[in-house]
Structure formats: C-alpha cells, structure tokens
A protein has these predicted regions:
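Acidic, Ser/Pro/Thr-rich low-complexity regulatory regions
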Residues: 1-175
Length: 175
C-alpha cells in the first residue's frame, strides 16, 4: 500500500472523528496497522498514535502525521465527505445504516461543508424519505449516483467534472 493511500485512510478517519461520526479508535487502528506492517519508519508520532486514547490525544498526533507527509496538500473536506458518502452507501446496502441514521449524518454534514451543490438533493430526499414513502426511491437513486461518482473521483475537481446537477434534479422527484 502506498504512503499517500495510507494517509488518505488516516485523513478520512480524522475527518469522521472531527465531525463526530467515528470513534478515535479508527485513527489508532491505522497507526497500529502501520506498526504491524513495520511501515512506521522512524516516525515516533505513529508509535505514539498507536497507543493514544481519546480524541484529545488522537487528533493532535494524527494532525502532526498528516501535516508532516502532506504539508499544504491536505485533502479537501468535500473530498473526504464524498468518500465518507461512498462508505455510507455500502453500509446502507449492508443494512448497517438506515434512512434515519443517514438523515442525522447528512443534517450535520451539509452545513459543515457550507451547503455544497452536490449534496442538496441527497440531503433533501433523505429527510423527506423519513416521512414520505414516495421519496424512498428518489433518495436511493441520488444516493447511488452521488456515491458512485465519489467512488470514481480522485479529487473534488474530478467529481465536479462528472457531476450533473440536472440529473440530480430530475431523479430527485417522485414518479
């Protein structure tokens, strides 16, 4: 596994932790895996992260590690959110997430990202699907569409080139 892909995993874990969507253990597990595979090199912060407990210990160490290897090239928050949406889609299909749990996540994510255009219909249809059965299918279509684009995209620019707001608008209305 390449170092940048490994850092992406850590950045995803940090993003989810900062948003309150995941426990600190995911960052710790990342560091433990680096140790297990003897990939920490001489990086004492990775060793310290592997033994860290709680958000107050984990976040500063994870931030130092990401800063050291990425510098100013940190991943965009929308990109991290998009990759999280892709993870959520898989969890939804596996029955580990529900429309209700997704609504709670999207309700926090949408304003935290400053209301991105690509999240409008997904957030709206998820909220509506809670109470109006006719919105279940439009929600699932949009969820599949957005998640599949983020699964393919290597960055926000690539996603934006693929994303079609008109398509989102068309499939966002019950038939």
């Amino acid at each position: 596994m390449k170092i940048m892909q490994q850092l992406t995993e850590l950045e995803l874990a940090v993003f989810q932790l900062q948003m309150g969507f995941a426990p600190a253990d995911r960052c710790v597990d990342w560091a433990v895996e680096r140790l297990r595979l003897d990939q920490e090199g001489e990086d004492l912060d990775i060793v310290l992260l592997a033994s860290a407990r709680g958000v107050d210990e984990v976040l500063p160490l994870a931030d130092v590690i990401i800063e050291r290897y990425r510098g100013a090239q940190r991943l965009d928050q929308q990109f991290l959110a998009g990759k999280y949406i892709d993870e959520l889609r898989a969890a939804y299909l596996a029955g580990r997430e529900s429309v209700s749990s997704l609504d709670a996540i999207l309700t926090r994510l949408y304003p935290a990202l400053d209301y991105p255009d690509w999240l409008v219909m997904l957030s709206r249809n998820c909220e509506y699907a809670l109470d109006v059965p006719d919105f279940q299918q439009p929600f699932e279509l949009e969820f599949d569409y957005i998640a599949s684009l983020w699964a393919e995209a290597g960055d926000v620019g690539a996603f934006e080139r693929l994303y079609d707001r008109e398509r989102s608008d068309r499939q966002g209305v019950p038939c």
